């Protein structure tokens, strides 16, 4: 991704660029959505360059986005789900909200006879 000076249009484009139906990269995309909301509230033009402080946040968020490319998620939540040794399977949902955004995440916890596995299943922000 080329680093360009931040504008309202570019921030929205970045926030909506990714196909993420399970919401696994929501924490990385959320700062772009919040920046866009703030620019809308300030009634900034679509192609107007943001001020220096917001541009620093833009650059920091882009850096986080690049680092997120290194994160890997398993396609299979738990390799041993078909095994007889499953003692319990639980879904844990956590949610929180603020004035700027809200979010929720769901984890699956599988307890086996000899181990416990916990994997993220999905998340959502607004």
Regions found by a protein language model. Give the residues of each.
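Conserved acidic
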Residues: 1-126
């Amino acid at each position: 991704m080329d680093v360009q000076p931040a504008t309202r249009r570019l921030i929205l484009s970045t926030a909506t660029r990714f196909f993420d139906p399970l919401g696994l990269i929501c924490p990385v995309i959320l700062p772009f959505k919040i920046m866009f909301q703030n620019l809308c509230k300030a009634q900034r033009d679509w192609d107007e360059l943001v001020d220096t402080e917001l541009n620093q946040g833009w650059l920091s968020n882009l850096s986080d986005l690049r680092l997120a490319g290194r994160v890997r998620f398993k396609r299979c939540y738990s390799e041993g789900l078909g095994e007889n040794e499953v003692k319990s399977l639980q879904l844990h949902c956590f949610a929180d909200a603020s004035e700027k955004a809200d979010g929720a995440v769901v984890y699956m916890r599988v307890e086996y006879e000899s181990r416990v596995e916990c994997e993220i299943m999905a998340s959502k922000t607004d």
